[in-house]
Amino acid sequence: MHHQAKRLPAISASGIGSLNRQACAVQHALRFLKDFILFAEKEEELQKLILRQHQTAAVDKVVARALDPQRTRGLVWHTPGSGKTYTMIKTAELLFKANEAQKPTILLMIDRNELEDQMLKNLASVGLANVAHADRIATLNKLLDERGQDYRGIIVTMIHKFRDLPANLNTRKNIFVLIDEAHRTTGGDLGNFLMAELPNATFIGFTGTPVDKTAYGKGTVQDG
C-alpha cells in the first residue's frame, strides 16, 4: 500500500517575517529577564526593580562604547530621580561579565560618603561577586598597582582617594571608570590625577545635570 508523503504548507514571505519577529521578541524578553531585572535594597527593604527603557538603552550603549577601543570617553545624562545608580550598577555588571573585556577592573566612583555606603549595599543585594571597597588611599593603591595585586573586579571608591597616587599606576586598557556626578568630580587636579594614574582606561561619566552643547559643561567627561 502506497502512502503519499505529506508536505508542510508553504510559508509566505510575510509569514517568515512574522516568525522572525516572534523569535526576536522571545530573545528580547529572555535577555530582559536575564540582564535588566535586579533586587536591591530600597527604603530598608529588598525590592525587585525593573530597569526602564531609558536605562536599558543607556546600559547597552555604554557597554558597546566601552568595549570599542577607539572610544575611551563618554557621558550619560539621566534626569534626577530616573535611576542613574542602577544604570551604573548594571553597566558595571555587564562589563565585568563581557568576554571581550578579558577580566577587567571596573571602578565605581562615588562623590559622597552616604552614596558610597548605599552603592555597596546595592551591589551586595544584586549578588555581585568580586566587589572591593577602597576606603583608603593605601587600599586603592594596593588594588590597582599593576606590579602588585592588579585586582580584577569592581572597586567602589571616591575620587579624592586618587590624590598622591603615582602616575601610570596601572596601564591596562581593560579598566573602566564609571564616574557618578562627573560634572563636579572630574574637573581640576583630581580629574587630572585620575587620568594620569590610569592613562589607558575608559572613562564614562554619569550626570543629572544638563550638558551645554557647546561647552559640554565644565568638568564633565566629554564624548570622544
Regions from the PLM with identified roles:
Residues 1, 171-224:
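Signature of the SF2 helicase/ATPase Hel1-core->accessory helical subdomain module
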Residues 1-105, 110, 114-130, 153-154, ...:
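ATP-dependent helicase/translocase motor core
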Residues 82-86, 114-118, 163-165, 184-187, ...:
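Flexible loop/turn segments at secondary-structure boundaries
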Residues 98-101, 147-149, 168-171, 195-200:
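Conserved catalytic network of the ASCE P-loop NTPase/AAA+ motor domain
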Residues 99-104, 131-134, 215-224:
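Flexible phosphate/Mg2+-sensing switch loops adjacent to catalytic phosphate-binding sites
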Residues 113, 134-143, 158-164:
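Conserved helicase motor
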Residues 138-155, 168-169:
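Conserved motor-coupling elements within RecA-like helicase/translocase cores
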